[in-house]
Amino acid sequence: MLMVQLNPFIIEGYLSPEYFCDRVEETALLTRHLTNRCNVALIAPRRLGKSGLIYNCFQQENIREQYHCIYIDIYDTKNFNEFVYALGKGILTALKPKGRKVWEFFLNMLQSLKSTISFDINGNPEWSVGLGDIQAPDITLDEIFAYLEQADKPCLVAIDEFQSVANYPEKTVEATLRKRIQNCHNANFVFSGSKRHMMALMFTSRSRPFYHSSSIMGLEAINEHTYLEFANHHLARNNKEISAAAFTYLYHHFDGITWYIQYVLNMLYTSISDKSLLQEDDVRMGIDGILSQQRFAYQALLYQLTAKQKQLLIAIAQEDKPSSLMSQEFLQKYHLGASTVQGAVKTLLDRDFITQDEGVYQLCDKFLELSLRAG
């Protein structure tokens, strides 16, 4: 049988510690917090590897064998109902591989939804619940927390993009969750978020329910030299190596952000070039290839914007992390009006085209940023 060779540079999800670069100290710290029954607020920009770190922590032997590990991403949730839906689905997904006795206990706790759970031909449960089936989200949430409290093992629940709850139309969600989490002694939580300003307010402001409720962890870019060693260890499988200069170019081109570096390395690993030593030109060609592949998707994305919104987006990409969009210098350089910018920037922020973090504006998607710079 022909064996398909695995590309070791994973760009979606988590496979195993072998394909996870470094984060040894961060994994140890997160593991220590959770096993010491501390909740954690994990704060870092998107695509820096927060979810990978959480999964890597969950794969540690003393975690994997002794806890039920649950991960949910609430980035796309828009209200309390959708949060409860995502939490219930995430728990069932985590419990299904652990056998009938484990997941059946959870389903028996969900009396408010029991009639809407279906089963496949093998008798395994499927989350066939519709959002409209959650008629009383507070009651369903109580049932979920009753399960967490009574589960046969302690539970670790990671909620990714946790800052989303602050944008729900229901303004009491933070207090609702804080109260239940405070009274749940059989579970600990990782609150992971990418919008640092919002997360900092949620966990350090005296007026917010989660004030001083969790240990706060930041995440920095992986050390460049460590990442280079990881890259060459795996490139060697395909009889390739990347030069230190080429990797430095790649690393700094994307500010050390893991996902983009992984994506380019993924492409270089399978490139048809017969060169054994990859140089800076090879990295440039790899990036150009990715931008070419994404061209039509980006065209469709930009089609959603008005001409003025697109003009501002291009200006931010060209300027490279401007600190002010209302300065006369910026407005004149890109032929923008102040009123135009005020209206457009809110749309771009709300729709996650751009982010404002640490005093600067930048595009959320660095490949899109490079594409706009190239014209």
Residues covered by each model-derived region:
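Conserved Walker B catalytic segment
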Residues: 127-196, 204
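Helix-loop-helix "sensor" segment of P-loop NTPases
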Residues: 201-252, 275-276
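C-terminal helical "lid" of AAA+/P-loop NTPase domains
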Residues: 247-253, 259-273, 311-314, 346
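Conserved C-terminal helix/linker of AAA+ ATPases
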Residues: 271-293
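P-loop NTPase nucleotide-binding core
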Residues: 38-39, 44-48, 52-156
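Short, locally clustered residues in the helix-turn-helix/winged-helix DNA-binding domain
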Residues: 34-35, 163, 255, 269, ...
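C-terminal leucine-rich, beta-strand-based interaction scaffolds used for sensing/assembly
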Residues: 2-7, 292, 296-375
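A short, basic N-terminal segment
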Residues: 1-40, 45, 355
